[in-house]
Swiss-Prot record:
EC number: 1.11.1.24, 1.11.1.9
Taxonomic lineage: Eukaryota, Viridiplantae, Chlorophyta, core chlorophytes, Chlorophyceae
Remaining remarks: Two alternative-length transcripts are expressed that differ in their stress-dependent induction. The longer product may function during photooxidative stress. It was speculated that the longer product is directed to chloroplasts, but this is not observed during nitrogen replete or deplete conditions.
Protein name in UniProt: Glutathione peroxidase-like peroxiredoxin GPX5
Biological processes, Gene Ontology terms: cellular oxidant detoxification; cellular response to oxidative stress; response to photooxidative stress
Disruption phenotype: Increases cellular levels of reactive oxygen species (ROS). Decreases cellular levels of triacylglycerol during oxidative stress (induced by nitrogen deprivation). During oxidative stress (induced by rose bengal or nitrogen starvation), increases expression of genes involved in energy generation and decreases expression of genes involved in photosynthesis, flagellar processes and iron transport. Sensitive to photooxidative stress (induced by rose bengal).
InterPro entries: Glutathione_peroxidase, GPX_AS, GPX_CS, Thioredoxin-like_sf, Thioredoxin_domain
Highest taxon listed in the record's lineage: Eukaryota
Active site residues per record: 87
Catalytic reaction annotation: 2 glutathione + H2O2 = glutathione disulfide + 2 H2O; a hydroperoxide + [thioredoxin]-dithiol = an alcohol + [thioredoxin]-disulfide + H2O
Length: 162
């Protein structure tokens, strides 16, 4: 059964367009807080490779730029979009820059964190934490920044084959 809490969420794309999560019903979703000036930034390449490998089977990857960790996403929407395209050829959707922790955290991350804690804590610890959501909208896994995109393939396969 579809999860109304997850599919009731919405956000805004980097270009300012509404992005209702109801459009994600029936898809596997990988949600990542991203940054342009982080030691983990090269993960964009692996995320794009995952997207190309699995998008036709129903995987959507959503990147959420965040400047809360070391000020590593200082740019505006146009600078972020240009960086992602020029350096990594990113074609998966990038959302508007937002906080992932604290009172002003994006509601998407408030929800994700409430569903999957990391080491008994809800707080996002750094850029490039990842949440995997199954085709019915259930948060099934959370991965640290250290988890490479390629290492997620077995979990993504499980979700896509379910």
């Amino acid at each position: 059964m579809a999860n109304p809490e997850f599919y009731g969420l919405s956000t805004t794309t980097l270009s300012g367009q509404p992005f209702p999560f109801k459009d994600l019903e029936g898809k596997a979703v990988l949600i990542v807080n991203v940054a342009s000036k982080c030691g983990f930034t090269p993960q964009y390449k692996g995320l794009e490779e995952l997207y190309q490998q699995y998008k036709d089977r129903g995987l959507v990857i959503l990147g959420f730029p965040c400047n809360q960790f070391g000020g590593q996403e200082p740019g505006d929407a146009s600078a972020i979009g240009e960086f992602c395209q020029r350096n990594f050829g990113v074609t998966f959707p990038i959302m508007e820059k937002s906080d992932v922790n604290g009172n002003d955290a994006n509601p998407v991350f408030k929800y994700l964190k409430s569903q999957k804690k990391q080491f008994m804590m809800e707080m996002i610890k750094w850029n490039f934490e990842k949440f995997l959501v199954d085709k019915s909208g259930q948060v099934v896994a959370r991965f640290s920044s250290m988890a490479t995109p390629a290492s997620l393939a077995p979990e993504i396969e499980k979700v896509l084959n379910a």
